[in-house]
């Protein structure tokens, strides 16, 4: 479902639209100590619903990780809050012919360890994302690329397999973060994940697992020093302690705020809540390789048994809409004429009967705060499944375990995900998740793959719309 996650950002303190981008509350000024004692470091403290599981930007797409990795690392392009694509580490780009893109890179940029940024780093970073040996979490994002050349230190030439008008936009989000070739090859992936080095406005200075990560401002940032000295990200998985920390002034921002708790924040004179429609969906991932979820009739029954309107009304206080498919409202080729996903428990029972379902366990794995309301939604959905005769089990797992299961594709049944529409196009969410090698690649369908591949390469928007309509 599409929801209003009650978003908050400090774009004057953190760069870009991806700085925070999730639920939270924001004090009306910096912490009192920072205002009163200007000789001390100006510190921003954020509490989120779980630890940062991965600092390596090519090995995570989860909210708890990427809102910080997009500030440690830069992309060649950057999508700003105005929705437009702006220069990042690339100052300009142009299409030559139908499938060759040339990017001019920003000069004088340094990584946090002092190494200069060059086209060699850009080439290495992008190729790493789709290298089968690397097994990254963003393997589907840049697979339209055929080859990359770096003719000089500040020019990058990318040849796509077929025309790809979305390439500059792809490079501005998941998978497009630039990592330092020399440093990563020297220290290896494990050390790089623990001690990441980027070109972004903050750099990691310490990390205590399941407690906090500390970032200091990059004084040499090419975009100018940000308006703070230090960023502290605390892990507070439970909602009540997270809210209490905010109200006591121990933190400045909290994320993953349940809608039914908003009044506690708005009722306090020093805190406030802001919201915006989330550019994505809350979806249930499915391990279709595991019985009984390998039976399409069982999956259809599970979908038909979910009363999404009730979830939006009761758990989200009306802050959301029921989607009509895997394309987010507002994206290219969103079809408003399609009805919302159906709720029909009687038909759900019929399909379970046709499937020969005999009470096998169906697991729904959830955290307590990876996405706001994930555990209450899981419990509500499981109850709806039980009502139609499904032996549904909810298992609560730690966020770090969830992240590992996502990387290794070892979910035992179903799980929550909150994919973001990264391109304003089905290719940026649906294909990224469900395409070959994507995070939800527990299934394959020849027609889906055929049409998805054809649509992502086509410049014929009429054909693209028809293709996406068929496969959704």
Stretches with model-predicted labels:
Residues 190, 218-264, 391:
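Ligand-site clamp/hinge motif
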Residues 94, 139-183:
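Surface-exposed binding/hinge segments that line
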């Amino acid at each position: 479902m599409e929801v209003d996650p009650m978003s908050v950002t400090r774009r004057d303190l953190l760069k870009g639209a991806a700085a925070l981008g999730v639920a939270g509350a924001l004090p009306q000024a910096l912490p009192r100590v920072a205002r009163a004692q200007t000789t001390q470091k100006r510190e921003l403290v954020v509490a989120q619903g779980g630890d940062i599981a991965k600092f390596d930007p090519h090995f995570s797409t989860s909210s708890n990780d990427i809102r910080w990795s997009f500030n440690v690392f830069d992309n060649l392009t950057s999508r700003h809050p105005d929705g437009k694509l702006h220069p990042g580490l690339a100052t300009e780009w142009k299409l030559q012919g139908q499938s060759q893109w040339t990017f001019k890179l920003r000069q004088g940029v340094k990584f946090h360890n002092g190494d200069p940024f060059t086209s060699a780093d850009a080439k290495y970073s992008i190729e790493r994302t789709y290298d089968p040996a690397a097994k990254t979490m963003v393997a589907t994002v840049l697979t339209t690329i055929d080859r990359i050349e770096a003719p000089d230190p500040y020019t990058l030439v990318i040849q796509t397999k077929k025309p790809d008008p979305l390439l500059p936009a792809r490079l501005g989000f998941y998978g497009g973060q630039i990592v330092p070739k020399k440093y990563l090859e020297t220290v290896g992936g494990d050390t790089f994940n623990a001690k990441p080095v980027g070109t972004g406005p903050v750099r990691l200075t310490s990390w205590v697992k399941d407690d906090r990560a500390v970032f200091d401002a990059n004084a040499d940032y090419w975009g100018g020093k940000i308006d703070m000295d230090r960023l502290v990200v605390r892990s507070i998985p439970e909602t009540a302690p997270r809210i209490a920390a905010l109200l006591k002034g121990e933190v400045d921002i909290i994320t993953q705020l349940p809608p039914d708790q908003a009044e506690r924040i708005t009722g306090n004179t020093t805190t406030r809540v802001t919201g915006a429609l989330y550019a994505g969906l809350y979806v249930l991932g499915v391990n279709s390789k595991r019985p009984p979820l390998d039976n399409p009739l069982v999956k259809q029954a599970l979908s038909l048994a979910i009363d999404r309107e009730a979830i939006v009304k009761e758990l989200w206080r009306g802050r959301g809409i029921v989607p009509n498919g895997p394309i987010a409202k507002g994206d290219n080729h969103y079809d408003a004429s399609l009805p919302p996903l159906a709720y029909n428990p009687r038909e759900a029972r019929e399909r379970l009967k046709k499937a020969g379902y005999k009470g096998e366990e169906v697991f729904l794995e959830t955290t307590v705060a990876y996405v706001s309301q994930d555990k209450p939604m899981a419990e509500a959905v499981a109850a709806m499944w039980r009502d139609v005769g499904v032996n549904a089990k909810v298992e609560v797992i730690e966020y770090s375990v969830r992240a590992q299961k996502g990387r290794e594709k070892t979910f035992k049944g179903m799980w929550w995900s909150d994919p973001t529409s990264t391109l304003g196009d089905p290719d940026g969410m649906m294909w990224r998740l469900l395409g070959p090698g994507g995070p939800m690649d527990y299934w394959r369908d020849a027609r889906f793959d055929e049409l998805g591949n054809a649509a992502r390469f086509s410049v014929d928007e009429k054909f693209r719309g028809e293709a996406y309509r068929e496969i959704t």
